[in-house]
C-alpha cells in the first residue's frame, strides 16, 4: 500500500514532513492501518528496539591523580569534590604551560613546539625549587619514553 507524502501529526492539523526515521517506533501500532507499525504475519509482531546514542565520555586526570595519591599516601582516599578541584588545577597548569610554550615558539619564529619550549615555559611559570623538580621529572619522563620506543 503506497504511503501518502504528508501525514498529520497528533497536533492540530500540522503536517509531518517525510517519513519516520528508520528504527524509530511509529506513533500507533494499529492492526487496521497497513504501515510500519502494523503487525505482519510470520514476523511474530516484534518491534525494533530503539538504540540510544551513547554520550561522549568526559576526559579527566582522575585516575592519574588517584595513582599518585596512592604512591604518596597509600591509606588516604579522596572525595569527588577534591578530585574535581585537582582535575581543574591540572587542566589550568597544562593550559598555562601550553600557551607559554606556544608564545615562546612564535617568538623564536618556529612552527613546532619542542621539549625545549616546554622546559622553558615550566621554568618561567613555576617558582624556584618546584620548577627544578618539574624539569628533572619531565626530563626523566622524556628519556624513559625515548628509550622504550
Curated annotation (Swiss-Prot):
GO MF terms on file?
A: DNA binding; protein heterodimerization activity; structural constituent of chromatin
Asked if Coiled coil is a keyword of the record, the answer is no
Instruction: Recount the PTM note.
Output: Monoubiquitination of Lys-144 gives a specific tag for epigenetic transcriptional activation and is also prerequisite for histone H3 'Lys-4' and 'Lys-79' methylation.
Give the compositionally biased regions (Basic residues): 9-20, 29-57
Please indicate the residue ranges that the annotation assigns to the motif SPKK motif 3: 14-17
Cross-link Glycyl lysine isopeptide (Lys-Gly) (interchain with G-Cter in ubiquitin) maps to which residues of the chain? 144
Task: State the span of motif (SPKK motif 4).
Answer: 19-22
The residue numbers the entry assigns to motif SPKK motif 2 are 9-12
Q: Which residues carry this modification: Phosphoserine?
A: 19, 24, 30
Name the family the entry cites.
Belongs to the histone H2B family.
- UniProt function note: Core component of nucleosome. Nucleosomes wrap and compact DNA into chromatin, limiting DNA accessibility to the cellular machineries which require DNA as a template. Histones thereby play a central role in transcription regulation, DNA repair, DNA replication and chromosomal stability. DNA accessibility is regulated via a complex set of post-translational modifications of histones, also called histone code, and nucleosome remodeling.
Q: What is the protein name stated in its UniProt record?
A: Histone H2B.3, sperm
Organism of derivation: Parechinus angulosus
Amino acid at each position: 500500500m503506497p504511503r501518502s507524502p504528508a501525514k498529520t501529526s497528533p497536533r492540530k492539523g500540522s503536517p509531518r514532513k517525510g517519513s519516520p526515521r528508520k528504527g524509530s517506533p511509529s506513533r500507533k501500532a494499529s492492526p487496521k492501518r497497513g504501515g510500519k507499525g502494523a503487525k505482519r504475519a510470520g514476523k511474530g509482531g516484534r518491534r525494533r528496539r530503539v538504540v540510544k546514542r551513547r554520550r561522549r565520555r568526559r576526559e579527566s586526570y582522575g585516575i592519574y591523580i588517584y595513582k599518585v595519591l596512592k604512591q604518596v599516601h597509600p591509606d588516604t582516599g579522596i572525595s569527588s569534590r577534591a578530585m574535581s578541584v585537582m582535575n581543574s588545577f591540572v587542566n589550568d597548569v597544562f593550559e598555562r604551560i601550553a600557551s607559554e610554550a606556544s608564545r615562546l615558539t612564535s617568538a623564536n619564529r618556529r612552527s613546532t613546539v619542542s621539549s625545549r619550549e616546554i622546559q622553558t615555559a615550566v621554568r618561567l611559570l613555576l617558582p624556584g625549587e618546584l620548577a627544578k623538580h618539574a624539569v628533572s621529572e619531565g626530563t626523566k619522563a622524556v628519556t624513559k619514553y625515548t628509550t622504550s620506543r
